[in-house]
């Protein structure tokens, strides 16, 4: 917030701040989890907050987008957290874990695309937690990061199910992550529906 406030003060002639807050963000912020875009802005900001879709669910936002004639690539794109990859790089954000997150996520997207899953799965991404796991590489102990694959299907983002991803696709992702991403020694697949888990880990 401090950096945002500093950068905002450098701008001239800007009166509004637009945010993509949707209704599930508001509902979940009341006792489930904190959302960056719900009640997190300083009161003394000189912007008027504009949240045009804050009372709509994700599927309703897409209906509005299509009605407005927005490109399909924009209307159907996957949600991405406002704080960026920091939400998926759990704990202290370090260069090595952020690199592992970017590289593993790129592999996941490429393999889902090749398998025809990119259009069938509502949202998918990888997570790198802030703990290490023991592994074995070249006959020696490895103490590296795990990568967690998260994939969900939903309509309104209030509930979500975990799709059945073909084993061959999961094996291909795992093999590539373990051979192509430095500092990773384990790949996990998150099978948790919402509820009990939320879509994002944080």
Model-derived regions, located:
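ATP/NTP-dependent adenylation/nucleotidyl-transfer catalytic domains that generate, transfer
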Residues: 1-202
């Amino acid at each position: 917030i401090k950096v945002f406030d500093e950068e905002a003060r450098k701008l001239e002639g800007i009166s509004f701040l637009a945010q993509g807050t949707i209704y599930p963000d508001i509902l979940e912020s009341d006792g489930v989890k904190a959302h960056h875009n719900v009640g997190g802005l300083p009161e003394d900001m000189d912007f008027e907050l504009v949240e045009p879709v804050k009372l709509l669910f994700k599927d309703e936002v897409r209906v509005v987008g299509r009605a407005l004639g927005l490109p399909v690539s924009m209307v159907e794109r996957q949600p991405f957290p406002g704080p960026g990859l920091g939400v998926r790089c759990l704990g202290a954000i370090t260069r090595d874990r952020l690199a592992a997150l970017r590289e593993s996520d790129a592999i996941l997207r490429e393999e889902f695309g090749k398998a025809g899953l990119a259009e069938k799965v509502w949202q998918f991404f990888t997570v790198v937690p802030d703990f290490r796991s023991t592994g074995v590489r070249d006959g020696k102990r490895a103490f590296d990061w795990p990568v967690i694959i998260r994939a969900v299907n939903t309509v309104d983002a209030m509930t979500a199910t975990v799709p059945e991803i073909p084993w061959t696709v999961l094996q291909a992702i795992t093999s590539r992550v373990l051979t192509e991403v430095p500092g990773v020694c384990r790949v996990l697949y998150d099978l948790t529906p919402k509820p009990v888990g939320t879509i994002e880990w944080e």
